[in-house]
Amino acid sequence: MQDHTTEGGFLSSKSSRNTVTNINIFDPANGASTLLFKAPKKEGIPIVIFETGFKNGEIEFNATHSNLVMNNSRISKREPKNKLLIGIRSADSKETTLFVSDKRGAGLKKLVSVPATADWHIDVKNSKLRVVHQTGKGVRIESYEW
């Protein structure tokens, strides 16, 4: 779902800026359509990541997220995970809040809020989402199941 800043239609717009504010999940098997979030996310949803397949020893993803996906070589063959990773970035604080759900939108939960001073990535080989914080001269790493 998009928040249009100028005239336009539901699926298209003449707007100079479109912001994705919710995600519609359509199940072609039964024709059901549901929104991922109960209320639109005014901040916008710039990050939607999910696994799509396996090829040449790597897990494939829905889009190019090379800076967010690491340790993705020599992976044992497996089916794609039934997970969505959604990121919402605050325009004010630049903090990114990460949510996970299954690919049908069920089980949506907030995973972590990542401050602008930290980095995060998916570690494919170890099935982890890692948040890396700089602490003085060292680092602090948080790991979450992916």
List PLM regions with ranges.
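Sequence signature of WD/YWTD-type beta-propeller architectures
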Residues: 1-146
